[in-house]
Amino acid sequence: MELQDKDLIEEKIGSEDIFDGTLLHVKRDTVKLPNGGTATREWIKHPGASAVIPLLDDGQVILVKQYRYPIGRITLEIPAGKLDAPDEDPLLCATRELSEETGYQAENITKLTTVATTVGFSNEYIHIYAATGLMAGKQHTDEDEFINVVKMPLSQAVELVTKGEIYDAKSVAAILLLERSQKENANV
């Protein structure tokens, strides 16, 4: 459903690059507001990303533990990574990240949803998939990635979400959507 409230739309009337990094690009735009006034919008331009929640035949999900420097904590997440190019197929990115971070290959990968991660200051979208029919292989992370693979029942992952112990937004969405999907399929 596309929202059509045209009285809310802001029009860009100026733009400048503040920072141009390897991953992120910071912009400062001047916008015309719906009431005719102007405002400044600082935002992060991001190439987008894909994430995948791997589900083993025995009902366990595969998660990854890694240190996240910006929050200074080790997190429990689903495998994910940025699109290598703006036109990269998100499904190919999800497949690559699954293999790199966990070593697994999947027979089936299905789209769960797409989420806008931080709509107040970034244009990043993450495409979230579920992977089944998994075959184990060798993990091959990037040189600057240090990741531990963790397997647990989906029910335990849901419990960790509800306790606030899994708090990464893409992972919360994926775990809860997969649980819902599993319940719906069980009722068919």
Where are these regions (language model features)?
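Long hydrophobic alpha-helical segments typical of transmembrane helices together
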Residues: V158-V188
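Short glycine/serine/proline-enriched coil/turn segments at secondary-structure junctions
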Residues: G21, P70, T118-F121
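Acidic, metal-coordinating catalytic segment for phosphate/diphosphate chemistry
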Residues: G14-A51, D57
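Conserved Nudix-box catalytic region and its N-terminal flanking loop in Nudix hydrolases
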Residues: E2, D7-I9, R41, A51-I53, ...
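Residue-level detector of beta-propeller blades
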Residues: K12-I13, K111
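Unchanged
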Residues: A39, G48-A51, K82-A169
